[in-house]
Each structure stands twice: as structure tokens, then as C-alpha cells.
């Protein structure tokens, strides 16, 4: 599950990186984006555009928007069967640009009860999945309501984690390189999801960060800085 992420790249730079246009009012950069917050997404096929949506999908058929915080992720394995998502795959695909995301791992600490330690994941500059310092997460979007009461929202697709990422968490966002991104944002209504969601042991930076990120009200650059963690079993890949 991907439950928190960062986005501090300005809208104009996101538009340039993903060959999109934007007329959006700048959303405040954030180092601790939680569910239901407003985020940028890239939509469109040939004519891409940056749009502002709420993170946490509210299906068009919902009675209200109360389910938003529970639908921040959609599993690749079941997205084609779930009523909330299956009809969105053909034409309501989007990309969620993030600078990084957080996951938590139960870590044994010397002399203390084990606790959940947050880790920060970001793109290695050498990686083909790095888009000018950003990761591109495959997403789905929709709009709830009618008339003056409209609520546009999105969800992030998740998949089985690669070997490296699974040391922290068994799931990961469905990340896109340039080729997969172009296919995901294309007008093709019959994309091969299985082909796009193949786990690739991509280059990604992972390091432990402060537990201050646990509180969504904390929001500054210190949240993504590397910290030292005393542990009885070292995390050999970090």
C-alpha cells in the first residue's frame, strides 16, 4: 500500500517533463501528502494536460464522497474485476507524478520493542524510471456528482514489489518508464495491463527517515532526510 508521498516539483516543471500543458493554480509543495489531499495528475493521450484531483477515488455511482480515504490504491491483480475501477481502465487512465513515497517496516531495535520504521523511496538519477527527479505512478481517475457539485478524484495502482523493495513492503506503486508511460496515457482502450505491470528490479533509492512523517500535519523537507536507525538485524540493501 502506498499511503503517503511527496511532490515538490512545480506544475510548470511537471508539464515540461511530461510534455503536457497546465493552467493550474500552483498547489503548495508537500513532503507529506496524505489521502484526500489535492494532487497533480497528468491526463490525456496526444494532448496531455496537468489536472488537480483529490487522492482517493470516489466512484461516480457512490452516494457521497465518504469513501475517498479508503480507495487511495487499486491492486493491479484485481482492478479489472472491481466495480469501482474496471470501467475506468479503457479511458480514465492518468499518471501521478511524485518525487518519492513512504512505506513502513516493522524493525527490531536493540533493547526496545520493535516498532514501525518509515522509509523513503525515490528515483535514482541513473534509472530509466526517473523523470527529472520524479517517479510516474499509474493511476485511474473519475468524477463524482453533477451540476455544481463535482468531485474529481484518483487512485494509484499497486503491484507486487520487486525483491529490493520487498525488504520494506510487499507492495509497490505501478511505476512507469517513458515507454510504458506513453502506452498508459495513450488513447488505446485495450492496453495490456499485465505487460505494463511486470515487476522490474528498478534502481531506486531507499533510506530510513524520521517518524515525524507519521503525523500528516508535519510537512517539511526534514521528513525525507536520511536518519540513523539502531537495529538488531541490519537492512543489508540500504
Residues covered by each model-derived region:
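Short linear sequence motif anchored by a di-proline
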Residues: 1-238
Amino acid at each position: 500500500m502506498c499511503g503517503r508521498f511527496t511532490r515538490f516539483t512545480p506544475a510548470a516543471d511537471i508539464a515540461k517533463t511530461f510534455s503536457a500543458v497546465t493552467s493550474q493554480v500552483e498547489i503548495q509543495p508537500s513532503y507529506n501528502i496524505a489521502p484526500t489531499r489535492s494532487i497533480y495528475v497528468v491526463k490525456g493521450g496526444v494532448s496531455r494536460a496537468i489536472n488537480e484531483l483529490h487522492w482517493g477515488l470516489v466512484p461516480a455511482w457512490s452516494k457521497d464522497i465518504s469513501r475517498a480515504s479508503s480507495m487511495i490504491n487499486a491492486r493491479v491483480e484485481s482492478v479489472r474485476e472491481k466495480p469501482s475501477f474496471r470501467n475506468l481502465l479503457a479511458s480514465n487512465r492518468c499518471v501521478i507524478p511524485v518525487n518519492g513515497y513512504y512505506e513502513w517496516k516493522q524493525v527490531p531495535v536493540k533493547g526496545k520493542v520493535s516498532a514501525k520504521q518509515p522509509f523513503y523511496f525515490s528515483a535514482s538519477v541513473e534509472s530509466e524510471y526517473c523523470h527529472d527527479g520524479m517517479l510516474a505512478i499509474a493511476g485511474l481517475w473519475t468524477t463524482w456528482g453533477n451540476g455544481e457539485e463535482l468531485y474529481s478524484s484518483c487512485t494509484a495502482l499497486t503491484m507486487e514489489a520487486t525483491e529490493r523493495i520487498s525488504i520494506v513492503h510487499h507492495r509497490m506503486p505501478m511505476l512507469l518508464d517513458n515507454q510504458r508511460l506513453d502506452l498508459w496515457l495513450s488513447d488505446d482502450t485495450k492496453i495490456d495491463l499485465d505487460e505494463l505491470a511486470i515487476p522490474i528490479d528498478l534502481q531506486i533509492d531507499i533510506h530510513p527517515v524520521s517518524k515525524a512523517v507519521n503525523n500528516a500535519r508535519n510537512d517539511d523537507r526534514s521528513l525525507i532526510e536520511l536518519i540513523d536507525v539502531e537495529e538488531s538485524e541490519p537492512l543489508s540493501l540500504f
